[in-house]
Amino acid sequence: MKNINPTQTAAWQALQKHFDEMKDVTIADLFAKDGDRFSKFSATFDDQMLVDYSKNRITEETLAKLQDLAKECDLAGAIKSMFSGEKINRTENRAVLHVALRNRSNTPILVDGKDVMPEVNAVLEKMKTFSEAIISGEWKGYTGKAITDVVNIGIGGSDLGPYMVTEALRPYKNHLNMHFVSNVDGTHIAEVLKKVNPETTLFLVASKTFTTQETMTNAHSARDWFLKAAGDEKHVAKHFAALSTNAKAVGEFGIDTANMFEFWDWVGGRYSLWSAIGLSIVLSIGFDNFVELLSGAHAMDKHFSTTPAEKNLPVLLALIGIWYNNFFGAETEAILPYDQYMHRFAAYFQQGNMESNGKYVDRNGNVVDYQTGPIIWGEPGTNGQHAFYQLIHQGTKMVPCDFIAPAITHNPLSDHHQKLLSNFFAQTEALAFGKSREVVEQEYRDQGKDPATLDYVVPFKVFEGNRPTNSILLREITPFSLGALIALYEHKIFTQGVILNIFTFDQWGVELGKQLANRILPELKDDKEISSHDSSTNGLINRYKAWRG
């Protein structure tokens, strides 16, 4: 994978000139000049997904210049490098092969000359056998009762992905109750333990090293709680399984290593739901539906790795994002799913994007002088409309938005879904075209308002429009379509990282806080006054000690 400063390319310079021509062009003008704009700036995927990017401040020339940037930065070569098992995570000397986890074609993928697919398939088969025993009730707890509740204990990628997917696919869930514990705050584990019965609960401890502070603290608390009821430590093996590679630590915890599900160093945490980390997903929706999730992602992988840039959905969305982030100065993107089951989707890709591309040093080790990853946030519609859409419509910041919705709902109650989708369609129209002063004035005249009221109120009712959006319409949210949607965003993030010349698959930014916390923890165990830090940190620690008593 080549290291190319994007700002030094001819394409970047051409884009800068093009931006000067485009910065005052409105989306309304673009639609007025081209009645065929929707068909030119939209595409379908597998008859499952329609991506409409026509309501953006772009032209065919814009996309051509952005695609030139991708070519100059050798995006095609980078894609080949990732899919072929090259160690593109250079700071950790690792391959990046979440695509192998969902490689349903089973074509060999090599790391250090070894095909990884036999091991991938072996773990999948092990997950299938284990999950079927739990779901069927064949697996019994220490008192002979079947499992009714599953508690996934993990953090970051070991929590966000499985939680998001199990929520998004709740219509496919079986009888097992799923719970997720991540925060080291004891409240999180305590509240979950109030809901479950030690006789019928299975805990999944998700930690590759089996040393993650938050996860192991919660796991030991769960073990202590369990043993208060079960008594004999031999019963731990019937109620705990591990998603890990540290067999020694897993065995010492009391877990049968036959129930340890491994994954590999080429699986990044925030791309790990496709691996053994997804065992909670399998237990929730069944193995066949999990395979459908993998198949949807694999279909998007094929699209991404074989489709030319001008028709490649992850590439197009990535390039449009760079256009706003680096030329218009937009610092944020909102992900707005109009589906309540998808309520954790934005949070999942908040980690997926910000931990991947939140870097200020390029692949050569130099501080960048351009924007890298955007701030990602969002909530489900229509809730967001009554919370933060005000700023998106009439604020001073540009917030490019992705609107996501299914055409078919899993809960066809009355006309709920039509009302939901009417809002979905209305919001992107309102953001793009706004409402002019002339229209507002005419509305007030039609209502018989007096001129003084009209003059005062009208400015507050004007919508400038020209706010960019993408609309992603799914036929229905199924395991397959969700898998494809997740992979679409994963590859968008990768594409942006390649072009921005940063390492997308490490996360050194999470380390310093952990190191300092480990240094501070012993200082909190007594009542001595602390003076070893800066005055602010000393003051906070000392007040904490005084208040805790």
From Swiss-Prot:
The keyword Isomerase belongs to this UniProt entry's keyword annotation: yes
GO MF: carbohydrate derivative binding; glucose-6-phosphate isomerase activity; identical protein binding; monosaccharide binding; protein homodimerization activity
Active site: E355, H386, K514
Keyword Calcium: no
Biological process (GO), any one: cellular response to oxidative stress
Induction remarks: Induced by oxidative stress.
Modification type N6-acetyllysine: residues: K80, K228, K234
Major localization class: cytoplasm
GO cellular component: cytosol
InterPro entries: G6P_Isomerase, G6P_Isomerase_C, Phosphoglucose_isomerase_CS, SIS_dom_sf, SIS_PGI_1, SIS_PGI_2
Annotated catalysed reactions: alpha-D-glucose 6-phosphate = beta-D-fructose 6-phosphate
Enzyme Commission code: 5.3.1.9
Localization, UniProt: Cytoplasm
Coiled coil: none
Pfam families per the UniProt record, alphabetical: PGI
EC class: isomerase
Regulation (activators, inhibitors): Inhibited by sorbitol-6-phosphate (S6P) and activated by CsrA.
Keyword tags: Acetylation, Cytoplasm, Gluconeogenesis, Glycolysis, Isomerase
Entry function: Catalyzes the reversible isomerization of glucose-6-phosphate to fructose-6-phosphate.
Subunit structure: Homodimer.
Family of the protein in this entry: Belongs to the GPI family.
Name of this protein: Glucose-6-phosphate isomerase
Natural source organism: Escherichia coli (strain K12)
Lineage, opening ranks: Bacteria, Pseudomonadati, Pseudomonadota, Gammaproteobacteria, Enterobacterales
Name of the gene this protein is made from: pgi
